[in-house]
Amino acid sequence: MKNPKFTENQKEIEKEEFEFLQKLNFIIKESLELFNTNLKNSMKFINYITLPIIMASIESKSFNPFSEIIEKHIAFILNSKMNSLGYKFLPLGYSSDLTYENDNSIIHIDIKTANLENPSDFKDTVPLGINQSSYPGVLDCKIRGKNIKADCKKIKVYPNIPTTYNNKLTITNALLFIYPDYKEIIDEIREDYIAIRELISINLKDILTPIEGSLEEFLNYKPSNEKKRLEPILDNIVRGYFIHDKLRHEFSENVEKDLEEFEKKIIGIAKKLKEREIKPVAILSISIPNGELAPHYDDEIVSGKSWGSSFRYHYKKSGNSVFKGLDNKASRAVFLHINKEYLPVLKKYFDPITVYELTEKRL
């Protein structure tokens, strides 16, 4: 069944979305030099966050300071530039990373980062939470690998964001920053770090003295939803020794020697991270359709990784990364920056590549 034609109201919504996308693209494009300068300044202190990165590498969750640094610098730029364009900063609960208001609209901007080695996070799609879109997502009610399916046509993934706030149009955008992988650098020291934790664990008696009862029983005590007491003790000893220069000379001479050797390795890893220049290889600006544009984007906006509570906007599905209701068929997904060194890699994942300059062009 073919989708109905766009109504005049839907065309007006697409026009406003397109006009704001142009404004956002201009802001980021003209601020790239400032962004790179600020990012370079943050990277001067990479040696101070190298150990936490190493520590997180053995956890199920990964501490990615580069995502956080990028997000904060972009937030700083947008907050100043948006104000100059007449948009007031408007913190809202259940909203995107940044929200703004003017006389006609409420703007949601989500800042996303993706590792170049994880194309599922950026290739032709952008993951969205229920606070990052006003468009209901299609719910696929089946279990993979099993002959179990339900008819969910009447149920969709409904977001927390409304299509309007007090008659002001909701406009949602995503800025996606793709950065180079650095996993192999951390892999060089991961096993050494595990060995250091084991070394400290074996020699805990040097700095941890039992007062009453069994020390081993205390260290193995595990309250529900927490780690064994041993784990945070080791974490704190590592941070105390290598970050705060505490607990020095508390261990035996042989243990101290191994700790000092590991410290030299941390310095070496910090140097390699700095040389990698972990800055965006590409910046992609994406306009996410307003929910009032349904059903025109139903094929592209579906339930995401967290089934029933997230979305994926497949902005390139069937080649339709455009404002469907506009005559100019401008792209909803535009590159604001590409490191030419990575262009051959990016072309494997994006075809065509639409770049924002003063006009759009294809590489």
Curated annotation (Swiss-Prot):
The protein's enzyme class: hydrolase
Domain of life: Archaea
Keyword list, A-Z: Endonuclease, Hydrolase, Nuclease, Restriction system
Cell cycle among keywords: no
GO molecular-function term, one example from the UniProt record: type II site-specific deoxyribonuclease activity
Catalytic activity annotation: Endonucleolytic cleavage of DNA to give specific double-stranded fragments with terminal 5'-phosphates
EC number(s) per entry: 3.1.21.4
Keyword Hydrolase: yes
GO BP term, example: DNA restriction-modification system
UniProt protein name: Type II restriction enzyme MwoI
Biological source species: Methanothermobacter wolfeii (Methanobacterium wolfei)
